[in-house]
Design a protein with these regions (language model features):
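Nucleotidyltransferase catalytic core that binds NTPs
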Residues: 1-188
């Protein structure tokens, strides 16, 4: 079985995340693509919203997307302590494709147990138009081109905090979850 991992804090999920999942799934002909919500990522600041809320929004967005084989995955938020990609990969029985953008690919050398990860996954290198190329010696890479979308979770949080609309930036089903919890000030 060919399994993709699209991981992130998804704080909150936005349309760019959904585009990545859909394009990686289709371009690589994957049997399953797991949108994995990070629990306590060791290289990032703690998320604003708790894992359960972020997962609920991801689950709503993915269900609304309605593409067979793309699923929301809460395995990392259920795991205590720092979450590492290698631990998630080791739980998968099949050929694993790890979706990663150029920015994160440049920092792979700092990842936990990176040598093991290199042996276990094919990188689904998500390339945005105009993004600089990245050299990944020793990695097996399958490039996936996606359309340029100028959206980020931090931008969405800032707009919500300022009371500005995020229509078109956050999947409507996910936005309903965000409204329910009211985690981001000024949510509308």
């Amino acid at each position: 079985m060919r399994v993709g991992i699209v991981g992130g804090t998804f704080d909150p999920i936005h349309v760019g995340h959904v585009v990545v999942a859909a394009n990686v799934h289709a371009a690589l002909g994957l049997d399953e693509t797991r949108v994995v919500v990070a629990g306590n990522p060791y290289q990032k600041d703690p998320p604003v919203a708790p894992g359960e809320e972020r997962f609920a929004a991801v689950q709503a967005a993915i269900e609304d997307l309605g593409i067979a084989g793309i699923v929301a995955d809460d395995s990392e938020i259920r795991r205590p302590g720092p979450t590492y990609t290698i631990d998630t990969v080791e739980q998968i029985d099949g050929e694993v494709f790890l979706a990663i953008g150029n920015d994160a690919a440049n920092n792979l050398s700092t990842w936990h147990r990176v040598d093991e990860l290199r042996r276990l996954v094919t990188l689904a290198l998500v390339r945005r138009p105009g993004a600089p190329s990245v050299e990944l010696p020793g990695w097996t890479v399958s490039p996936v081109d996606i359309p340029m979308l100028d959206v980020s979770s931090s931008m969405v949080r800032e707009r919500l905090a300022a009371g500005l609309p995020v229509d078109g930036l956050v999947p409507p089903a996910a936005m309903r979850v965000v409204h329910k919890y009211g985690r981001y000030a000024g949510t509308r």
